[in-house]
């Protein structure tokens, strides 16, 4: 029965992807029906804020994005610092320590939601609502806006205006869908209140303080925007965030909704729907491979315990919630790292070595399917690399969407693809070379190395999940992961926008018999191979020293 539920869940991922992709294309490219519904409200926003609806250059678009995001980081930073004297603080929580506030503000603006604090004890209701939830809308709206400009550039059209796209992302996508999802979560038992904690009497007569809050509205945008941060420290293992299997499936659907839709949006916007389908199917195959790998490993149980003859019919149940079970915990772990959300319904630090390898690889690749917007930019980056390699092998100038890929584009892409592992491996090496980093490790040996690398991989990929055995709420970890999150977020977005702007100016080369097609299964295979090979070449030595070595040791 459990496998039937898994298949149905997978089918739901597939069935909603194309309709959502079509809706996104209409929402941003203009639709009379949508303009009639949302247009008056949007024009009012533009009038109040002084936004002019004109086409920007890629530099203007990128500058607008960085300045708006930077302003939001500063505002939210001071909310966190001053929350102790601000209203909506029934628990009288004090202001955040400076480096923690720095880390948290960047974390949520970068759509990472790395949390070096426990949500219910670290933030007031005001900080949760005005700080965290606000950024949970703004962060994915930023990247969804940028990916639309990116696709327009690839299609040879004007990039558009960042502030217009940002507003439309909020009004036409995130606010309405999150509102509906929040109502469903309330119906499923997720609390939504501004009242303080409830004191309950337990069976043995003791008193227990039960924390609550505006959780349902928080969870809806947490998953839809691929944010992932928890209202509670236990994240989606907490029964108030994720009461049962229905809420569990809904959360996974929300996580996958926009990332899986974007290939279809892209196909419609560039006039090649088949290429969009090829990208979707290719990535889904990689996703399935990851799910099969982690599930097989978790169902086989812990190798060390198996050697003692201990029964493991339920698989490795350490760190998992009984109400979700091993299979759906494995699926959730695959989804949350494939869609770069970072929400967890099981503790990733307790996964088996190979089970923990899958989330790590998903984040290292950062392209299956990746988070809202940012992940799709990486998908196209790998697609262009696949075309470039294919062109070199047959001695032709590589072309993508009928435009020649030349030195300028490849230099930008080369720098972008190297920057991600440089952040992960460079900062991991720094942490391992000083006691400021190693003192946080709770496990010696290979697993301790994986804890460190996982933290920086999660930060660079804007995922936010963690091997929580790492004691990371220290100035060193707050500052270094904050820098990694900021650089990992904005560097690739800006460089790839420059690539799209460069391709926009090029003329379309007529298709000939020798043109390498990017809308067939051959390209899909080369595309997958490029992702796997580039990822393996870059990160394989670290994976051998971490989870693979741990697995062999336990065996």
Swiss-Prot record:
UniProtKB keywords: Cell membrane, Ion transport, Membrane, Potassium, Potassium transport, Transmembrane, Transmembrane helix, Transport
Keyword Membrane included in the entry's annotation: yes
Highest taxon of source: Bacteria
Pfam family of the protein (one): KdpA
GO cellular component: plasma membrane
Main location: membrane
Keyword Ion transport among record annotations: yes
Membrane topology: Multi-pass membrane protein
Transmembrane segments: 2-22, 60-80, 130-150, 173-193, 246-266, 278-298, 374-394, 412-432, 483-503, 525-545
Localization annotation: Cell membrane
Record PANTHER family: POTASSIUM-TRANSPORTING ATPASE A CHAIN, POTASSIUM-TRANSPORTING ATPASE POTASSIUM-BINDING SUBUNIT
Functional description taken from the UniProt entry: Part of the high-affinity ATP-driven potassium transport (or Kdp) system, which catalyzes the hydrolysis of ATP coupled with the electrogenic transport of potassium into the cytoplasm. This subunit binds the extracellular potassium ions and delivers the ions to the membrane domain of KdpB through an intramembrane tunnel.
Subunit structure, interactors included: The system is composed of three essential subunits: KdpA, KdpB and KdpC.
NCBIfam families, alphabetized: kdpA (TIGR00680)
Protein family membership: Belongs to the KdpA family.
Protein name: Potassium-transporting ATPase potassium-binding subunit
Organism: Bacillus cereus (strain 03BB102)
Organism lineage: Bacteria, Bacillati, Bacillota, Bacilli, Bacillales
